[in-house]
Structures are given as C-alpha cells and as structure tokens.
Design a protein with these regions (language model features):
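Short, small-residue-biased leader/transition segments that mark boundaries at the very start
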Residues: 1-7
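Short amphipathic alpha-helix with an adjacent loop that forms part of the alpha/beta core around
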Residues: 8-14, 36
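Extracellular ligand-binding/catalytic regions of CAZymes and related secreted enzymes
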Residues: 11-12, 23, 71-86, 120-125, ...
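Loop/turn elements at helix/coil->beta-strand transitions in domains of secreted/extracellular proteins
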Residues: 14-18, 50-54, 144
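The substrate-binding groove and active-site-proximal loops of carbohydrate-active enzymes
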Residues: 21-37, 152
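Short catalytic/ligand-binding loop motif for oxyanion handling, primarily in non-cytosolic enzymes
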Residues: 28-29, 62-67, 137, 156-158
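A glycine-rich, often tryptophan-bearing local segment used as a flexible ligand/cofactor-contacting loop or short
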Residues: 31-107, 112-114, 127-128
Length: 233
C-alpha cells in the first residue's frame, strides 16, 4: 500500500536549508495545481520567512491562480508577465553584477533557452537582465533568501554559479572557501571520514587553481589535463 506521512508539511521542512523548485509552469516538476493547497504554499512561505533558502529555476511555483503566475512571486521577488499586468509600472532593471552569486562569472551567464517576460518586483536585486527580461535575481523574504534563475544548462561555470546561489540562499557565504577550488574547472572532493581528499581537473587542458581546505588554509596547484591528485587530511 501507499505510505503516507503523518508529519505536518512544516515539520518536513525543518531539516532543510534550501528548497529548489525547477521546471515549467503547470508541470509535475514545479507543482502545478498543488500550489492551490494553502497548507503547501504557506508552509514554504513560512520556511523562507523564518530563514530558509529557496531557489527557483524556469517557472518556479508556476500555476495561474488568484492573480499570479508564480505562486511564490512575493518570495522570489519576480513574476511572469501574463497580460494582466501590462499596465503596471516596471522600473526595477538595474543589474547588480558584483553580487556574491556572480563573483566567479568570468563570462556572460548561459541561461540556455531561459524564460521570457519575467520582471522584478520592488525590492528585488536584479543580477542579470537581457532586453528588460530578468534572467537572475536575488530577494530577501523575512529572514530568508530566494534566488530566481531562468535556466541552468549544465556547465562547470553554471555549476559554480548554482553552488554560490545555494550558499547565499542558506546564509552560508562564509563556507565558500571550504574544500573549494578558485578555478571552477577544478573540483575538490573531501572524504572526511576516510581522512582523504582529492583535487580533480575536469578538463582536457592543464589548469591552475588555488585549493582551499579548512580553517582558511589554501595552496596553489597546477594540474595536467584530467589529472587527479590525492591528499591526506
């Protein structure tokens, strides 16, 4: 038989730092009609308001209901233009390229197909907009933080940007330089219980990086193409 959970939704979220909602509007991926359930929407709002993180990609919480397309528009700080808000003043287009999330972006962010007709609400930090369509934004909601990204096709650069978005939304920026490579083409994998860590060059070219371990310790490293180096902790 199907097992159901007796815990209230809010308690299911207690162990989480960040929720990620990815996909197109009205799909199983983003939730669809489930957003009409006030217990679900209020639990997630409460989670973020009390200090949790929320990252939405594509059309997160997308379901036309009660005058909104994004049911978490006030959490994310962005909304999708649906024709009903054409007469609203939309003036929040100033970009903030120095934001923590973008500090490793050494080239224009690739959003893939992205999404069109996304605009920022008042008080939202627009990180990237193209032709007055928001592609990435950051927003404080209560004690919590939300990030909107229009699309995240896989690449080493995008992995780094998403990682920074997760840390920022979790108020964990100070954890960035822990088992970390300054060069996003290189990864650090720590196996703390086994007392080992490795540094991996993910490319077919030599790479130079600064490796950060713990306590702010770091060292410079050169890696040949596809090289993996192992170290004791």
């Amino acid at each position: 038989g199907v097992q159901t959970c007796a815990l209230p939704i809010s308690h299911l979220l207690d162990s989480l730092d960040v929720i990620i909602n990815v996909g197109d509007a009205d799909t199983a991926h983003t939730g669809g009609i489930w957003w009409e359930d006030p217990e679900i929407s209020s639990a997630i709002r409460k989670f973020v308001w009390n200090g949790g993180g929320f990252i939405g990609v594509g059309e997160p919480s997308g379901h036309p209901y009660q005058g909104h397309i994004f049911q978490l528009a006030t959490v994310l700080g962005v909304e999708e233009e649906n024709g009903f808000t054409l007469n609203y003043d939309k003036y929040n287009w100033e970009e903030h390229p120095d934001h923590f999330i973008l500090q490793d972006a050494d080239q224009p962010v690739d959003f893939g197909e992205g999404k069109r007709n996304i605009y920022a609400l008042e008080g939202t930090e627009v990180l990237v907009q193209r032709n007055k369509e928001v592609q990435m934004a950051a927003h404080d909601f209560g004690k919590g933080r939300a990030v909107y990204i229009s699309g995240v096709p896989y690449s080493f650069a995008n992995s780094r940007t998403l990682y920074r978005a997760i840390l920022w939304s979790a108020h964990s920026e100070d954890e960035l330089h822990t088992w970390f490579s300054s060069n996003y083409n290189v990864e650090v994998h720590a196996y703390v219980k086994n007392g080992k860590y490795c540094v991996v060059n993910n490319t077919y070219e030599p790479q130079d990086t600064t490796v950060y371990t713990t306590d702010g310790s770091s060292f410079a490293l050169h890696l040949d193409a596809n090289e993996i180096k192992w170290y004791e902790i």
